[in-house]
Design a protein with these regions (language model features):
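N-terminal secretory signal peptides and thylakoid transit peptides that target proteins
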Residues: 2-20
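N-terminal Rossmann-like dinucleotide-binding module
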Residues: 35-125, 435
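Contiguous beta-strand/loop segments that form the cofactor/metal-binding neighborhood of enzyme cores
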Residues: 45-72, 264-341, 369-383, 399-401, ...
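Hydrophobic residues in well-ordered beta-strands that form the structural core
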Residues: 83, 174, 199-201, 311, ...
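Beta-loop-alpha module in the N-terminal Rossmann-like domain of NAD(P)-dependent dehydrogenases
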Residues: 129-191
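Rossmann-fold dehydrogenase core element
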Residues: 187-205, 224-228
Length: 436
């Protein structure tokens, strides 16, 4: 190879823009004829702009531009979280999600199991003196690194832990369902407001890209008006000893655990509140798993816009998590809608004389990292969370209406949460920015 054509690393760095026309000995006319104009930042090394590293789009018009590189905050500037409760969800999903978070970090643990907490702390580099028992809120309060707590205990313990966190002056991210009753949820909202701390309910699907795209498409009117919605979330359950089958700890069975995703998902999709609810509950007899809680629930909601939503949930079926939106000129089918991962969206609509079925390709993101970063951003910018306590309170009220409708066999009249008004998304904070 001729020395004139050998590109060294020094030449590449000196050229700044990578394989520019100058480096290849090409004139300006040749460059213009062979491709798009030179980018405003170096093609291969990128540049720092507004505190971020940016690269120009290196693909041609036939492909979508790649996303920008991640821009995590320095660890010392991220919001420190204490995880309260070290069960399956914390250990399998939430703690690993901090590795993908950009604005949040885990700095403390609270658990009733000292051995488990000690081992987990060692695995995640958490100091031994930042590990607490459930009766050590005063010690946690004194830890300045803890700005927020994530409550991941059984549902029946949410109220007490949220009140303790608020009393400690810590912002609160609480798992769903918010509580065991609307009265408890109301108390939690009031306690956090009085303490001047933020309260967010962990409705992860409202932050997940595919669910957000369904909401965007449904509300855009691109495929006409939404007329009907179907939502189903079901799975089998075993181990009669687990806390989810004990009413005092769970508050109910399939409905508050997994059926809540259908209820909240439809509300978030439409941005309005139902006006009436009908429901049925079926629980197998002589099954010791369901001595205290229900197995299967079907409920129908009618909305002011005329939309009818048919929802179902069960602890007795093969895993299925589906959301389907029917509009006047199309349909949106979200497979694995409420799962931790694996979402797939199909959009059907008329295209001339035939039906077109599209599958938008979106970037899958860790839902727990997304909600952690949203809470962190709300703390850093003093912003109301998208899914605040009022969002969880309204769901508690509506679930009580579902149980009442099933018990009486009669429709139950419902409406907006008191004090929130009649507007769209009345129980929610500001809309999420696109791409976040």
């Amino acid at each position: 190879m001729s020395d004139d054509l050998r590109l060294s690393r020094r030449l590449l760095l000196a050229g700044g823009a990578g394989l520019t026309g100058a480096a290849l000995g090409l004139g300006a006319g040749a460059r213009a004829a062979s491709g798009p104009p030179a980018p405003s930042v170096p093609a291969d090394t990128g540049a720092v702009q507004d505190g971020r590293i940016v690269f120009p789009n290196w693909r041609d018009d036939g492909d979508a531009p790649p996303p920008p590189p991640p821009a995590p905050m320095p660890p010392s500037e991220r919001v420190g979280f204490a995880i309260v409760g070290l069960g399956r969800l914390s250990l399998e999903e939430i703690l690993p999600a901090f590795g993908e978070a950009k604005k949040a970090r885990v700095v403390a643990l609270m658990s009733g199991s000292a051995d488990k907490a000690k081992l987990t702390a060692a695995q995640y580099g958490i100091p031994a003196d930042a590990v607490y028992g459930y009766d050590q809120w005063d010690r946690l309060k004194a830890n300045p690194a803890v700005k927020a707590v994530y409550i991941v205990t059984p549902n029946g313990l949410h109220r007490d832990n949220v009140l303790a966190a608020a009393g400690a002056g810590k912002h609160v991210l609480c798992e769903k369902p918010m509580a065991n009753s609307s009265a408890e949820a109301q108390e939690m909202v009031e306690a956090c407001a009085k303490a001047g701390v933020k309260l967010m309910i962990a409705y992860r699907c409202q932050y997940e890209p595919f669910n957000r795209e369904v909401v965007r498409l449904a509300r855009s009117g691109e495929f006409g008006r939404v007329k009907m919605v179907e939502a189903f979330n079901g799975q089998t359950t075993g181990l009669p000893e687990q806390w989810r089958l004990r009413k005092a700890l769970a508050g109910g069975g399939a409905l508050p655990d997994i059926g809540l995703y259908c209820l909240n998902g439809v509300r978030a999709l439409l941005g309005e509140e139902p006006v009436s609810i009908q429901a049925q509950i079926v629980t197998p007899e002589n099954d010791r798993r369901f001595k205290e809680v229900e197995e299967s629930v079907a409920f129908t909601m009618r909305f002011p816009s005329g939309v009818i939503a048919q929802c179902g949930t069960s602890y007795g079926v093969h895993e299925s998590r589906e959301l389907r939106v029917h509009t006047t000129s199309g349909s949106l089918d979200l497979h694995n809608a409420f799962a931790y991962r694996g979402q797939r969206l199909t959009v059907a609509h008329r295209e001339g004389s035939h039906v077109q079925r599209d599958e938008p390709v979106l970037t899958h993101k860790n839902q727990f990292a997304l909600e952690l970063d949203h809470m962190a951003e709300c703390i850093l910018t003093d912003r109301r969370p998208r899914t605040p306590g009022e969002e969880g309170l309204q769901d508690m009220i509506l679930m009580e209406a579902i149980y009442a409708a099933a018990r009486t066999g009669q429709p139950v009249t419902v409406g907006p949460l008191a004090g929130t008004g009649q507007g769209t998304d009345a129980t929610r904070g500001p809309a999420l920015e696109e791409g976040k």
